[in-house]
UniProtKB/Swiss-Prot annotation:
First-tier enzyme category under EC: ligase
Keywords: ATP-binding, Ligase, Nucleotide-binding, Protein biosynthesis
Gene this chain is encoded by: gatC
Catalytic activity reported: L-glutamyl-tRNA(Gln) + L-glutamine + ATP + H2O = L-glutaminyl-tRNA(Gln) + L-glutamate + ADP + phosphate + H(+); L-aspartyl-tRNA(Asn) + L-glutamine + ATP + H2O = L-asparaginyl-tRNA(Asn) + L-glutamate + ADP + phosphate + 2 H(+)
Its job: Allows the formation of correctly charged Asn-tRNA(Asn) or Gln-tRNA(Gln) through the transamidation of misacylated Asp-tRNA(Asn) or Glu-tRNA(Gln) in organisms which lack either or both of asparaginyl-tRNA or glutaminyl-tRNA synthetases. The reaction takes place in the presence of glutamine and ATP through an activated phospho-Asp-tRNA(Asn) or phospho-Glu-tRNA(Gln).
Family per record: Belongs to the GatC family.
EC numbers for this chain: 6.3.5.-
Keyword Heme tagged: no
Pfam families: GatC (PF02686)
Name of this protein: Aspartyl/glutamyl-tRNA(Asn/Gln) amidotransferase subunit C
Annotated source species: Rhodococcus jostii (strain RHA1)
């Protein structure tokens, strides 16, 4: 019995707002069933004796140090704005009332 049916693929497509043809539904059902079969094989691997680990590779942090540097003052940030009101940027309204 397949792990995922054509109807389940159609349901997922509707939830994702994807318009799929009948041929695509059949194709994706087969592909997803194959993927789920491979995942099932992985879940059957005996791993009870394997200790949990965060990362199998010894990776060190390669980011730069977090150093505080001076930023813009509110006045400097607002100085290039086309419109300012009460110390804030004024932008065009994009939502209607109550949204």
């Amino acid at each position: 019995m397949p792990a995922i049916s054509r109807d389940e693929v159609a349901h997922l497509a509707r939830l994702s707002r994807l318009a799929l043809t009948d041929a695509e539904l059949d194709e994706f059902a087969g592909q997803l069933d194959s993927i789920l079969s491979h995942v099932k094989v992985v879940t059957e691997v005996p791993a009870e004796d394997v200790p949990p680990m965060a990362n199998p590779n010894a990776v060190t942090n390669v980011t730069r140090p977090d150093v505080i540097v001076p930023g813009l003052t509110p006045e400097q940030a607002l100085s290039g704005a086309p419109a300012v009101e009460q110390g804030r940027f004024v932008v065009p309204q994009i939502l209607g009332e109550g949204e």
